[in-house]
Amino acid sequence: MITQGDRRPPKQMRSRRAGSPGRACGFAWLLVSALMVQSSLSTMVAAQGLPLIRDREIERLLSDYASPIFEAAGLGGGRITIRIVRSNVFNAFVVDGKNVYVHTGALTQSQTPNQIIGVIAHEAGHIAGGDLAALRERIRRDQTKILLMRILGIGAAIAGGGAAAVAAGDELVLRSLLAERRAQESAADQRGLRYLNRTGQSGRGMLETFRRFQQQEFLSARNQDPFVRSHPVAANRVALLQDRASKSPYFGKRDTPRLQLRHDMMRAKLSGYLERPATVFNRYPRSDNSIPARYARAVATFFRGGPKGLPSALAQIDQLLKMQPKYPYFWELRGDFQMRSGRAGGAVKAFRKALSLDPKATLIRSQLANALLALNTKPATEEALGHLKRSIRDDRVAEDPKPGTYRSLANAYYRLGRRPEADAAIAEAHFASGNVTQAKIFAKRAKAALKRGSPTWRRMDELIAFNTEK
């Protein structure tokens, strides 16, 4: 089930909005801003409040794509997380050394697994090369340089040199910065190709992606995909990529049919959940009897009719289950539709089956817990409590667990009469949402009633002492 994730960006992405530049430095700031549009750093500000989504099936697939690449890049061990951004434009970017952000538009527009793997390899090249840290430092230095050159230029203008002296210094710095950015992009390409070679994969997908966007460089920025603006594609860069990629012994290697099927099912699921039903039925007509097409139509059938469409949607899911009875995410889908239709009992059965087929699925475990809470019985609530605590403990995909999971945990504690633990869970929910003030209020209330020195008491003490100025 595709769910809305925590909109709060990682701590490295939280930044204050820059104030308006003064009149004297306006053009210099415009130059720096223009550079940042050409870099992945542009997304640091845009990422505030990113509409992140969570889905076990898709996250598992992307992890299978990325894990070998990250290992080859020396970034393995679960250090890097793939995060999914709900946006229909093609884009992927990094803002730190911990996360790679991929838009749903990139996932749905990529025809093959290898194309997305190539994008991930390129972004891994940026992380391994320390490009963002280097670019931040370069921008910091050159902002100072621009200011000094502008002061000197103003002096020259007063002396009779004219405004051209001011603009010339700005342009020199901008050209230098853009040259460095182009060098970083080319270096990330080459690192990405090395990672693909080390893992026995083709560079064809990366080449196809950059060829696709090369022509967009001639369009205005408003009509370009964000990926083009953050990854400038020069003709000589594509030619170099073509030369290096085609020399690999793996260039002609294709994705396996099984991996291609999983990729197509991901695209179908995203279409079903995120696009209008009419669009889905047009994209996947009834004449298409493939599993991905059936998958997309089952989702669209439910969302077109709501609870009234449940019988037809369930019938379509049951047909999918006849073809793949051990595929956990068809069972998850069955549970999702029943839960949305107020049939908690049926949802519990479906989620139990899904979890038995994928025991590490913390998201499905949370869904099962919410279905159990909907039964509103003490035994079900006690079972839900155990699932929620385990889900929070085991979820390593997000930097912080979802606020919604903590709220469900609080609900379970309240029902069982465990008010201090419930207040502690609400404090965590507010903190995960970025509402530190409310988090401190509930943390103080919880701490006053908890056993002194207990793990939860110590955690509440940490929240109370948290300094928002850090």
Located regions from the model:
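Catalytic Zn2+-binding segment of zinc metalloproteases
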Residues: 124-140
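Extracytoplasmic and endomembrane cell-envelope/extracellular-matrix remodeling and assembly machinery
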Residues: 47-49, 54-56, 60, 82, ...
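Canonical positions in the second alpha-helix
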Residues: 320, 353-354, 390-391, 429, ...
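Short coil turns that delineate tetratricopeptide repeat
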Residues: 325, 359, 396-400, 417, ...
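Structural motif corresponding to the intra-repeat A-B loop/turn of tetratricopeptide repeats
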Residues: 304-307, 341, 375-378, 416-417, ...
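Helix-start (N-cap) detector for alpha-helical repeat units in TPR-like alpha-solenoids
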Residues: 291, 328-329, 362-363, 399, ...
